[in-house]
Swiss-Prot record:
This is Neuropilin and tolloid-like protein 1. One of its GO terms (cellular component) is extracellular region. Residues 291-327 form the LDL-receptor class A domain. Involved in the development and/or maintenance of neuronal circuitry. Accessory subunit of the neuronal N-methyl-D-aspartate receptor (NMDAR) critical for maintaining the abundance of GRIN2A-containing NMDARs in the postsynaptic density. Regulates long-term NMDA receptor-dependent synaptic plasticity and cognition, at least in the context of spatial learning and memory. Residues 23-344 are extracellular. Residues 41-155, 172-287 form the CUB domain. A motif (PDZ-binding) lies at residues 531-533. One of its GO terms (molecular function) is ionotropic glutamate receptor binding. Keywords: Cell membrane, Disulfide bond, Glycoprotein, Membrane, Phosphoprotein, Postsynaptic cell membrane, Receptor, Repeat, Secreted, Signal, Synapse, Transmembrane, Transmembrane helix. Glycans are attached at residues 306, 340. GO terms for biological process: anterograde axonal transport of neurotransmitter receptor complex; memory; neurotransmitter receptor localization to postsynaptic specialization membrane; positive regulation of excitatory postsynaptic potential; regulation of long-term neuronal synaptic plasticity; visual learning. Interacts with PLZ domains of DLG2, DLG3 and DLG4 via its C-terminal TRV domain. Interacts with GRIN2A and GRIN2B via its CUB domains. It holds the Pfam family Ldl_recept_a.
Length: 533
């Protein structure tokens, strides 16, 4: 039993010793970290014309596991020249992968790199192209060395050599705070900080409420000389206005939102005399991290903003959660009323115009059809037939008793030609009084069957033999003789008009020559005999 108690005492003592050792080790580690923090990466002396800075413990060996950042800023229209002392020693390695010094041309760790240096040979003289140099010293956990000492001075920027020395800049600072606010460059002119012809280097200090951070969102941004950071830029600092706290710098055509980690933000605008048209407008919002309190609104992006910022017409969250579903809460403004009225008027006017266009198209389509139907109804077929139908010849008979048997021959000859086409010529002499050529073609007169029957019914002279039928040539000659010789001797009182098959009177009736058979039989017989000879 006693032996068991002794074992327990031994185990307990060992545990106590272990805990005391761990506590001591933790205390030593905390002390070491505090010492490293208090060392501040060597010394740094600044003055108006330049300065000097060194690695930690220089000229003794620098400590392991150390990283130091040095950012040098010159005045406007000045550049930086950096020199390393000859007493220089940093652990050598291939491409300086271990301990090294890295120099960049600008204020950020992503600025263009100038070079990375290590070994026993000090780097050459380094010149910046602008107002800033970014320098980093890194030491790993093994093989420490003496380190470095560097000095720098400011020189005039050759890009502004023709403009001469910069005039003293006017004091231009602003103080702002609260749950939200707007920072804008127009405040410089409104508050009389500088004239329109002066270069400006203004700063806005924004202070958030306790336990709050700051979110910055650009509402308007334009640089007169884009991509020329020496002439105009907008810079954002997080925590102070020193170059070490520079968060972002904008001098191109785009500016992004910035989320600060502290409750103090600094906005800086630089513009020389030829860049005073540069402008910006920025909204700052104070927020707290979740969990959100009762008087705050959760933005779904690890932001809790004041309830008074919800549905205020401005997007205070990273995403517009605070302005969604706010139409029923917002009062209709005069601009909204005018917009709605204008939209109604435009819509009604557009409908009226469309209706008028449709009516016009319908009228234009139906109007030609109406005219065509009207013209078709006005067409008189009788007039058309009167113009194009050839004339109809009417027969006339003699009331006298001196007719001979020649009428029978004439009737027979006319009956043979009653189916011929009607003549379209208006000249009777071309058909009946023409030359031998017209006689051979024959007349185009169309005697109907009724007309021929009238001729056959006429009485003949008994005792006289009928004249035998004649051929077509002889009949045509006789027709010519009738129209030429007997036309002048035709007595109107002895003529009787015989109705024809024409359904109406032609407009050429006055020009129709009626065939008159007069004279003595001897005269016809003599002409007939003469023709046969």
């Amino acid at each position: 039993m006693i032996h068991g108690r002794s074992v327990l005492h031994i185990v307990a003592s060992l545990i106590i010793l272990h805990l005391s050792g761990a506590t001591k080790k933790g205390t030593e580690k905390q002390t070491t970290s505090e010492t490293q923090k208090s060392v501040q990466c060597g010394t740094w002396t600044k003055h108006a014309e330049g300065g000097i800075f060194t690695s930690p413990n220089y000229p003794s060996k620098y400590p392991p596991d150390r990283e130091c950042i040095y950012i040098i800023e010159a005045a406007p229209r000045q550049c930086i020249e950096l020199y390393f002392d000859e007493k220089y020693s940093i652990e050598p390695s291939w491409e300086c992968k271990f301990d090294h010094i890295e120099v960049r041309d600008g204020p950020f760790g992503f600025s263009p790199i100038i070079g990375r240096f290590c070994g026993q040979q000090n780097p050459p003289v380094i010149k910046s192209s602008g107002r800033f140099l970014w320098i980093k010293f890194f030491a790993d956990g093994e093989l420490e060395s003496m380190g470095f000492s560097a000095r720098y001075n400011f020189t005039p920027d050759p890009d502004f050599k023709d403009l001469g020395a910069l005039k003293p800049l006017p004091a231009c600072e602003f103080e702002m705070g609260g749950s939200e606010g707007i920072v804008e460059s127009i405040q410089i002119m409104k508050e009389g900080k500088a004239t329109a012809s002066e270069a400006v280097d203004c700063k806005w200090y924004i202070r958030a409420p306790p336990r709050s951070k700051i979110y910055l969102r650009f509402l308007d941004y334009e640089m007169q000389n884009s991509n020329e950071c020496k002439r105009n830029f907008v810079a954002v600092y997080d925590g102070s206005s020193s170059v070490e706290d520079l968060k972002a710098k904008f001098c191109s055509t785009v500016a992004n939102d910035v989320m600060l980690r502290t409750g103090l933000g600094v906005i800086r605008m630089w513009a020389d005399e030829g860049s005073r048209n540069s402008r910006f407008q920025m909204l700052f919002t104070s927020f707290q991290e979740p969990p959100c309190e009762g008087n705050t609104f959760f933005c779904h992006s690890n932001m809790c903003i004041n309830n008074t910022l919800v549905c205020n017409g401005l997007q205070n969250c990273v995403y517009p959660w605070d302005e969604n579903h706010c139409k029923e809460k917002r009062k209709t403004s005069l601009l909204d009323q005018l917009t709605n009225t204008s939209g109604t008027v435009i819509g009604v006017t557009s409908c009226i115009v469309i209706i008028l266009i449709i009516i016009s198209v319908i009228v234009q389509i139906k109007q030609p059809r109406k005219k065509y139907v009207q013209r078709k109804s006005d067409f008189d077929q009788t007039v058309f037939q009167e113009v194009f139908e050839p004339p109809h010849y009417e027969l006339c008979t003699l009331r006298g008793t001196g007719a001979t048997a020649d009428f029978a021959d004439v009737a027979d000859d006319f009956e043979n030609y009653h189916k011929l086409r009607r003549s379209s010529s208006k000249c009777i002499h071309d058909h009946h009084c023409g030359s031998q050529l017209s006689s051979t073609k024959g007349s185009r007169s169309n005697l109907s069957t009724r007309d021929a029957s009238i001729l056959t019914e006429m009485p003949t002279q008994p005792g006289k033999p009928l004249i035998p039928p004649m051929n077509r040539r002889n009949i045509l000659v006789m027709k010519h003789s009738y129209s030429q010789d007997a036309a002048d001797a035709c007595d109107i009182d002895e003529i009787e008009e015989v109705p024809t098959t024409s359904h109406r009177l032609s407009r050429h009736d006055k020009a129709v020559q009626r065939f008159c058979l007069i004279g003595s039989l001897s005269k016809h017989e003599s002409e007939y005999n003469t023709t046969r000879v």
